[in-house]
Amino acid sequence: MIQRTTDPAAGSSTSGPPTNSLSWGSRHNGKLYTLEVVQHPIRARMCGFGDKDRRPLAPAAVATMNVYREDNTQVEVDDIDCSFFLVTVDLWSEDGKQEMNLVLHPNAAQDRGPPMPAKPRRPTNPPPPSNTHGSPPAPAIPFPSYGPPTPYYPPWSAPASDRSPSSASAVLPSISTSFGRAPGPSSATPYGPQYGPPSASSYGPPSASAYGPPSASAYGPPSASAYGPPSASTYGPSSASAYGPPSSASYGPPTSSYASSYPPYHYGPPPPPFGNYGSTSNFDHSQPVTSSVDQETNSPVVTTTARDDDQREGEASTSAAGNPRADPSNSGAPSTSPTASTMGRRESRGRRRRREEREGPDGGPDLREPIEPGSTKAREEEDARTGTEKGDPKDKSDAQRATYTRTLVGPLSSNATRLLDEHRKPGIFFLFQDLSVRTEGTFRLRLRLMNVGAPPAPEPGAAGVHTGVSPVLAQVFTKPFTVFSAKRFPGVPDTTALSIAFNQQNMKLPLRNRHGSGSKRRRRGAGGGSDDEESD
C-alpha cells in the first residue's frame, strides 16, 4: 500500500527521510524506504528532435536509497537485497506541479491542418480514341498467301447458284477469319464498309478475277484440284492450274469415291452477323469450331464452345454503341463511339478479373492468404478501391499520436548498484548518466522507487519478478536545472568528485575533458607550449 510518511521521531541518531513536501517515503513490513538525490543536474544543452545528437545532463543525476527500521536506525547496505529495486524518472516543471514529458513535434504541424483532397487516380488503360471525324477506318491490307488455298467451299447439297444469303454468310470466310485481321473496305469482299443491307449479288458465284494471282480478293473457293488427293502440284510452286478459273465440277457434290475416301470436312468459323458490318470482329479463333449440315433444310449448323460466353455477352451489351445501324436515327451516319468488340473485350477482362478474385487465378477455390480486417493490406486495398492517396490521414488517432514526442530522451529507469561514494562509504545508488532534454527551459526530475520482486520482496528471499502491480515506495524531486539552446549554452560544468569516484569503479559517467586529448598534449609539450587546462 502506498502512503505518505512523516519525519521519524526527533532525537534519532540517523538521518531521516527528506522534509520536502514533494518528496516522501513509505513503510513496508515495519521498514521505511526513502530516496535521496545526492547529485543534482545543473545545466544541459538541448538535443533537439533528432535521435543521434545526445546532450546529457551535467552532472549526471544520482540517487541513493535509505532504509530505516522502526526505531529510526538505518539498515546496513549489506543487509539489503537490492536485486529487484529500481528507480524510474520523468520530467516535470520548475515548480514540480506540471508534467512535461511530451512536446509538440515541429514537423507535425502539417498533420494538424485540414487534410489535402485526394488526387484523382489516372486510369490504367485509357479507352481508345473515338473517330470524331466520322471517316471509315483505314482498309487492312492482308499479306499474300503463297501456299495452297484453304479449302472453304459451299455445302454439298446446295448448288452454287441456289445459295441463299444466310447459307453463304455461314460458309464464305471473311478476311478476319482467314488472316486474323479486321475486315476493311475492299472491292472484292462482300463485307465492305457499306451500311445498307447486303444485296443478293454479293453471294453469287465468284467471278474469274477471284482466281487470278494472289491478292487481297483471292478468297473465293479453290479450284477442283484442291478437293482431290494431295499431289505434288498442289503443294508445289504457284501455277495457272492452282489459281485459274474453276471448272463446272468444282461446285457440284463430290463423287462417291471421294466421299468414301475422305471424311467430311469441318467448316471454318462463320463471319460476323449482319448487324456488325464495318466493325472489328472479336471472335476467338483459338477455340475449335464444328459445323454440320441439316438434312431437312440443307443449311449449315455451326457449333462453338462455351468459352466465349463472357466475350459474347460483352458484345451483346455494347452492340448499340458499336453498331450504327442499331438506332434508326443514325442510319447511314458513321459511328463515333468505340467499337463493340473493343468494349466487349474490355468488359470481359473486368469480368475475368473479378472471377479470378472470387475463385482464384486457375478457376478453383481461392487459396490465397486471407486478409484480416483492419490490417495494413486491407487498408491499402481499400485505398486502391476508393482512390485515396497513401498520404491521406485515414486514422485521426494515429495522426494525433505522431504529433507529440518525448521531451526526456534516454533510459528512464535505473537498477540499484552497490558502490562507494567519494568518501569511500558504501551505499545503494541509482545512476542516470544518459538523459537528454529536447527543448530549452527550466525543469526538474521526479524519481520514484519501487521493488519488482515477487514476495517476500522487498524483503530478502525473492526468487523472481512478479507480474502484478508494484507499489511506489518513495518519491523525490531534483533541484531545478536549466536547458539552453546551442547559442546560449555556457558550457559543461566541472566534473564532480562523486562522478570521478563512480568512474573509477567502472561506471561510465560523462566526465569533462580537462586536459584535452593526449595528442594535443604531446604536441604542446614538443613545441614548448604551456600545459594549461582546456575545457570542451
From Swiss-Prot:
Residues 1-27, 106-143, 157-409, 508-536 are annotated as: Disordered. It is found in: Nucleus; Cytoplasm. Residues 306-315, 356-399 have a biased composition (Basic and acidic residues). Induction: Expression is down-regulated during fruiting body formation. GO terms for biological process: sporulation resulting in formation of a cellular spore. Residues 114-143 have a biased composition (Pro residues). Signal peptide: none annotated. Gene3D superfamilies: Velvet domain (2.60.40.3960). It holds the Pfam family Velvet. One of its GO terms (cellular component) is nucleus. Residues 158-170, 190-265, 328-342 have a biased composition (Low complexity). Residues 25-512 form the Velvet domain. Residues 1-26, 280-305, 400-409 have a biased composition (Polar residues). The keyword Cytoplasm applies. PROSITE patterns: VELVET (PS51821). Keywords: Cytoplasm, Nucleus, Sporulation, Transcription, Transcription regulation. Residues 511-525 have a biased composition (Basic residues). Its main location: nucleus. Component of the heterotrimeric velvet complex composed of laeA, veA and velB; VeA acting as a bridging protein between laeA and velB. Forms a heterodimeric complex with vosA; the formation of the velB-vosA complex is light-dependent. Belongs to the velvet family. VelB subfamily. PANTHER family: SPORE DEVELOPMENT REGULATOR VOSA (PTHR33572), VELVET COMPLEX SUBUNIT B (PTHR33572:SF3). Component of the velvet transcription factor complex that controls sexual/asexual developmental ratio in response to light, promoting sexual development in the darkness while stimulating asexual sporulation under illumination. The velvet complex acts as a global regulator for secondary metabolite gene expression. Component of the velB-VosA heterodimeric complex that plays a dual role in activating genes associated with spore maturation and repressing certain development-associated genes. This is Velvet complex subunit B. It comes from Schizophyllum commune (strain H4-8 / FGSC 9210) (Split gill fungus).
